[in-house]
Each structure stands twice: as structure tokens, then as C-alpha cells.
Curated annotation (Swiss-Prot):
It comes from the Bacteria. GO terms for biological process: tRNA wobble position uridine thiolation. Its main location: cytoplasm. This is Sulfur carrier protein TusA. PANTHER family: SULFUR CARRIER PROTEIN TUSA, SULFUR CARRIER PROTEIN YEDF-RELATED.
Length: 80
């Protein structure tokens, strides 16, 4: 478990590729630079897609974990 306190939470539960990453893009865009976003997803492809998204756009994936088929991600938006 982590003690990160997110500035925003994206609940993509029940959504399948490409919806979680599309929603992630919108949420990150609306987040202040350096802000922390927690993403909750159930699509296993997010294990591949979200780290690639962060790497490609320069955001920091602080942590990812799985809890009973739910995937959790903590993403720090890059500074402008």
C-alpha cells in the first residue's frame, strides 16, 4: 500500500482499451504541473499502455500495483 495522496482520481473501472488511456490523457492535461493522479482500471492492457504513455509524454509513473484484478497507478505530471 502507498501513502500517496492524489490530487485527482481517474476511475476507469470496466473500460477497455483504448478508453482508459484516452481518459488518462484528458485527466493529465487538466492536472497542474507536478500534480498526482491515481488511476483505477480493470483492463489488463493498462499494465502495458499506462507505463508507455508516461514514458512517451515524460510523466513519472511513481507506482503501479494489482489488487484482485484491479490495477492501480500513481502518476506525477511532468513540470511544464
Amino acid at each position: 500500500m502507498t501513502d500517496f495522496t492524489p490530487d485527482a482520481i481517474l476511475d476507469a473501472t470496466g473500460l477497455n482499451c483504448p478508453e482508459p488511456v484516452m481518459m488518462l490523457h484528458t485527466h493529465v492535461r487538466n492536472l497542474a504541473a507536478g500534480g498526482l493522479l491515481k488511476v483505477i482500471a480493470t483492463d489488463p492492457s493498462t499494465r502495458r499502455d499506462i507505463p508507455k504513455f508516461c514514458n512517451f509524454l515524460g510523466h513519472e509513473l511513481l507506482q503501479q500495483q494489482e489488487e484482485a484484478g484491479t490495477y492501480l497507478y500513481w502518476i506525477r505530471k511532468k513540470a511544464d
